[in-house]
């Protein structure tokens, strides 16, 4: 199990801007990842997120917990068998679910039928990683630009300079992927 502080700036962009950035930076390879969200009202109250990310037939269980700047991510590599058991509401014990015990939550208690698939393109920079994402969820699609950084001040300035080239502005982060997914579910009721 590993922990890291995720600090990122992110905005929604249009398909045209998405394609322009990929063209400008001559990005020729991308990869797909699918986030399976494990939802529960207690996590929503805490503003925590629990997900399983599938990428290249590898699986990672992640608990995200908000901090003053960014999110504390606690990650655990799991196998497909464990992922399938969690999705089927079977009891699993591991370090991530141990963190949820104080809230009387276990692996059997989550809504597990919502997922989001991202086609991700990346640009490495001196301050972090720019991700140009095409997201598909619940019959919808959107385009997102994320900048995952290690130094808040230097990273923010780099991000502002980067998006300025595309006549984009930044005030605050757009809604998270899970928030957009939940909103789409509520709109379909």
What are these regions (language model features)?
Residues 1-189:
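Phosphate-end processing signature that detects enzymes handling 5′-triphosphorylated RNA
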């Amino acid at each position: 199990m590993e922990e890291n502080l995720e600090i990122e700036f992110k905005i929604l962009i249009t398909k045209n801007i998405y394609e322009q950035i990929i063209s400008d930076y001559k990005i020729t390879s991308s990869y797909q990842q699918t986030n399976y969200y494990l939802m529960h009202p207690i996590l929503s109250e805490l503003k925590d997120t629990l997900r399983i990310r599938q990428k290249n037939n590898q699986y990672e269980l992640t608990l995200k917990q908000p901090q003053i700047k960014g999110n504390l991510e606690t990650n655990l590599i799991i196998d497909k068998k464990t992922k399938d058991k969690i999705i089927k509401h079977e009891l699993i014990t591991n370090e991530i679910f141990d963190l949820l015990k104080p809230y009387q939550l276990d692996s059997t208690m989550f809504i597990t039928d919502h997922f989001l698939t991202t086609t991700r393109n990346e640009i490495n920079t001196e301050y972090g990683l720019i991700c140009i994402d095409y997201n598909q969820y619940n019959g919808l699609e959107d385009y997102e630009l994320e900048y995952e950084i290690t130094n808040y001040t230097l990273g923010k300035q780099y991000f502002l300079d980067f998006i300025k080239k595309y006549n984009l502005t930044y005030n605050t982060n757009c809604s998270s992927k899970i928030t957009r997914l939940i909103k789409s579910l509520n709109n379909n009721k």
